[in-house]
Every structure is written in structure tokens, then in C-alpha cells.
Curated annotation (Swiss-Prot):
<dbReference type="InterPro" id="IPR016163">
    <property type="entry name" value="Ald_DH_C"/>
</dbReference>
<dbReference type="InterPro" id="IPR012134">
    <property type="entry name" value="Glu-5-SA_DH"/>
</dbReference>
<dbReference type="InterPro" id="IPR016162">
    <property type="entry name" value="Ald_DH_N"/>
</dbReference>
<comment type="function">
    <text>Catalyzes the NADPH-dependent reduction of L-glutamate 5-phosphate into L-glutamate 5-semialdehyde and phosphate. The product spontaneously undergoes cyclization to form 1-pyrroline-5-carboxylate.</text>
</comment>
<protein>
    <recommendedName>
        <fullName>Gamma-glutamyl phosphate reductase</fullName>
        <ecNumber>1.2.1.41</ecNumber>
    </recommendedName>
</protein>
<keyword id="KW-0521">NADP</keyword>
<dbReference type="InterPro" id="IPR016161">
    <property type="entry name" value="Ald_DH/histidinol_DH"/>
</dbReference>
<keyword id="KW-0560">Oxidoreductase</keyword>
<dbReference type="GO" id="GO:0050661">
    <property type="term" value="F:NADP binding"/>
</dbReference>
<dbReference type="GO" id="GO:0004350">
    <property type="term" value="F:glutamate-5-semialdehyde dehydrogenase activity"/>
</dbReference>
<dbReference type="GO" id="GO:0005737">
    <property type="term" value="C:cytoplasm"/>
</dbReference>
<dbReference type="InterPro" id="IPR015590">
    <property type="entry name" value="Aldehyde_DH_dom"/>
</dbReference>
<dbReference type="Pfam" id="PF00171">
    <property type="entry name" value="Aldedh"/>
</dbReference>
<keyword id="KW-0641">Proline biosynthesis</keyword>
<keyword id="KW-0963">Cytoplasm</keyword>
<comment type="similarity">
    <text>Belongs to the gamma-glutamyl phosphate reductase family.</text>
</comment>
<dbReference type="GO" id="GO:0055129">
    <property type="term" value="P:L-proline biosynthetic process"/>
</dbReference>
Length: 417
């Protein structure tokens, strides 16, 4: 494939920056991160002004309200981004971690963590991802090429300019943080095939974006999957817990990948549980799309279509199905789930253990909200995404997931015979 000359320049600059950043010390990287945090606050008005342009353009295009909400920044949001950078400073640096052993022949082997190299982030209308990705890549010694959604281009331009300038002012390599300002989709298609320049691509966004990257990229991809997350309310569930957990998982922040999209209810408790949950959802403005049995119990529920069962709504909508038991619930999750986060509400230990062991997902819960699938809530610190694949990384991906292993071998005239 012929690459745009400008894209080759960006790729080469990233490679050069990654080479230098790989051996940058922890103190130097932390100093740069603190400067980035301060710079965001110092440029708050410019950032808000640029973001306002993006939001106004999105509204004029008739963009969904939920997407506009994800796009919009506030003064508080900028302070939160600044605080997030400071939190990354407090995280341990994975680069250089490892172990050392000596073989019987005296050969000494050291396995140590090293950066991946050049990370390309392809994401949608969340300006905060620009800052989060840049911070995590810098702390883990990686150069990053950022390609955000066209809806957030003005926000991403100013954010990347501010943080990249701050990092470089503290001695970080020039071009360690770069943004693809050209919103032409051909550039994205080329970026996905830049083997030799880019070491890994991490897509972060909706199903369409992720599927496109996985399908078209020749560069290795870490798939941060969509979240069609389920809650199964068992026949031996504490129904008050069930209402609390399901309501939280759906409404606390509906536009994120670990939000609940479907609730499966054991037929033994459906007549009692669904009205309790349904009234609370209706008061909050959550639309319920249910199976025939659900609609018979909740007359205000809309009838679910086949498409609904596999849809990541990212909105105040939830699908609901009455099932015979845990086996049918797990079969449904197997068919429609995306291997992200699944939860069971039950007081039966044996049923809970079956669900934990038999459901294939990055995170499986008992009596807890799926909203806990998060690097910070798991104690990993900030995350670059939540991986639903099994190779290299799975679940919330923190700093360690942005490194790989290198073997350093020490000998004294050791030769193979």
C-alpha cells in the first residue's frame, strides 16, 4: 500500500521518539506528566472554546444527545483530566520490572518489562481519551499516535498541542505524542497497515469502529470490545439487591462499555421482581424492551426485537428477558454477550460458582454491578481500555498491558555444544 507522505513522516517521528522514550527514567516521565497536568489547567479557556465548536457542530448535524454529552467538556472535566494525569504519576512504572535467575551452566537470565514501541489509538468522540492515552503511553515508555473521532477534532487539536508541548518542555522526545489532524478516513485505513512504523493499534469506541479495525488492520490489534453486559437475577436472589445492582449498572453512567444492557430474570421471581425494577426504571426514564413474558408483566415495556438482544445501547434503554434458570441465562449470554462483563444476583453459592466458572467474559461478578470493570476500581490505576480478547491483555488495561517482555542474558564465554 502507498502511504501518504505526511503519514510516513508521522510514523517515522513516532519510531524515533519511541526509541528515546524507551530508556527515559521514571522521574523524568513523572515530571513531564505533572507539567502536562498543569498545562491543561493553564489552557482551560482555550480548551473549552475549541470544545464548544465541536459541540455546536455536532448539534447542527443532528448528532444523538448521548454522543453530544460524551463529546462535551466542562471546567470540572478539565480538572478531572488534570487530576488523572497526577494519578498516573503515582502509579508504579512497569518498565524495568522483572526477574533474574541463573541456569546450572552459569548462564544468567533476566526477564524485564519494556515498552511496546509505537501505539496507535483510534477512538471516537471522547476528548478525555486523548489525554488518558497520551499519559499512559508516556509513563510506559511508548510513543503514541492519536486518531480521535472527527466530531472532536477541534478539542483533540488543542488538547494534544497543550500536553505534547508540556511533555517536550520537560525533555521528552519531540513527537512522542502526535495527533492525526487529517480526518480523511483513508489516513485511518493507511495507519492500520503501517507495519514497521506502528507496533500495536488499540481501538476504543463502538462496535462498528472496533470491527472495522479488527477486520482491516495488518498491524497487531488489542481489541477493546463493546459491552453487551448482562445481569442474571436468579430464583434465589435477594430481590432488593437485584433492583439496586441492576439499576446502578444501567443508570449510573449509561454511555460506557461496562454499563448494563440486558437483564435476565428467573421465571420463579419474575412476577415479583420485574414490577419493582420496572417502576424504578420508568421513574428514571429508562425504556424497557422485553420478551413476551416481560411485556405481559410490564404492559409499558416495548416488545424486543432479535436485534435488541445483541445491541450495546449506551443509552437509557435496557432489554429484559424471563428465563427458566441459570442454564438458559448462560446460553443467552453465550449467544449475545461480547465477553466483557456479566453479573449474577443470587444467594446460592453453587449457582454463583457455576456462573463464575462457565460464563466466558473478561469480568464476571456475583452480587455486584458491572460498572466496577475499570482500572481504577480494580486497583490498577488509570486504564487505556478494557480488552475482551484473550491474547496479550484481558480486562482493564493499565500500564503493564502497554509493555512486553525482553530477555537479557549474561554469559562468560558460554557457547552451545
Amino acid at each position: 500500500m502507498d502511504f501518504a507522505p505526511e503519514l510516513i513522516t508521522i510514523g517515522q517521528k513516532a519510531k524515533d521518539a519511541a526509541r528515546k522514550l524507551a530508556y527515559a527514567g521514571t522521574a523524568a516521565k513523572n515530571k513531564a506528566l505533572l507539567a502536562m497536568a498543569e498545562a491543561l489547567l493553564n489552557h482551560e479557556q482555550k480548551i473549552l472554546e475549541a470544545n464548544r465548536k465541536d459541540v455546536e457542530a455536532a448539534i447542527q448535524k443532528g448528532t444523538k444527545k448521548s454522543l453530544v454529552n460524551r463529546l462535551a467538556l466542562t471546567s470540572e472535566g478539565i480538572r478531572q483530566m488534570s487530576d488523572a494525569l497526577k494519578e498516573v504519576v503515582n502509579l508504579g512504572d512497569p518498565v524495568g520490572e522483572g526477574e533474574f535467575w541463573t541456569r546450572p551452566n552459569g548462564l544468567r537470565i533476566q526477564r524485564t518489562r519494556v515498552p511496546l514501541g509505537v501505539v496507535a489509538m483510534i477512538y471516537e468522540a471522547r476528548p478525555n481519551v486523548t489525554v488518558d492515552a497520551a499519559a499512559l503511553c508516556l509513563k510506559s515508555g511508548n510513543a503514541v499516535i492519536l486518531r480521535g473521532g472527527s466530531e472532536a477534532i477541534e478539542s483533540n487539536k488543542i488538547l494534544s498541542k497543550v500536553i505534547a508541548g508540556a511533555a517536550e518542555s520537560q525533555g521528552m522526545p519531540t513527537a512522542c505524542i502526535q495527533l492525526l489532524e487529517n480526518t480523511n478516513r483513508q489516513w485511518v485505513q493507511q495507519l492500520m497497515k503501517m507495519n514497521g512504523y506502528v507496533d500495536v493499534i488499540i481501538p476504543r469506541g463502538g462496535a462498528g469502529l472496533i470491527e472495522t479495525v479488527v477486520k482491516e488492520a495488518t498491524v497487531p490489534v488489542i481489541e477493546t470490545g463493546t459491552g453487551v453486559c448482562h445481569a442474571y437475577v436468579d430464583g434465589e436472589a435477594d430481590l432488593a439487591k437485584g433492583v439496586s445492582i441492576v439499576f446502578n449498572a444501567k443508570t449510573q453512567k449509561p454511555g460506557v462499555c461496562n454499563a448494563l444492557e440486558a437483564v435476565l430474570v428467573n421465571e420463579a421471581v419474575a412476577q415479583e421482581f420485574l414490577p419493582l425494577l420496572g417502576e424504578k426504571f420508568r421513574d428514571y426514564g429508562v425504556e424497557i424492551r422485553g420478551c413476551e413474558k416481560t411485556c405481559a408483566i410490564l404492559p409499558y415495556a416495548a416488545k424486543a426485537t432479535e436485534e435488541d438482544w445483541g445491541t450495546e445501547y449506551l443509552d437509557l434503554i435496557i432489554s429484559a428477558k424471563v428465563v427458566q434458570g441459570v442454564d438458559e441465562a448462560m446460553d443467552h449470554i453465550y449467544q449475545y454477550g461480547t465477553k466483557h462483563s456479566e453479573t449474577i444476583i443470587t444467594e446460592n453459592y453453587t449457582t454463583a460458582q457455576r456462573f463464575l466458572n462457565e460464563v466466558d467474559a473478561a469480568a464476571v461478578y456475583v452480587n455486584a454491578s458491572t460498572r466496577f470493570t475499570d482500572g481504577g476500581r480494580f486497583g490498577f490505576g488509570a486504564e487505556i481500555g478494557i480488552s475482551t480478547q484473550k491474547l496479550h491483555a484481558r480486562g482493564p488495561m493499565g500500564l503493564q498491558a502497554l509493555t512486553t517482555m525482553k530477555y537479557m542474558v549474561y554469559g562468560e564465554d558460554h557457547i552451545v555444544t
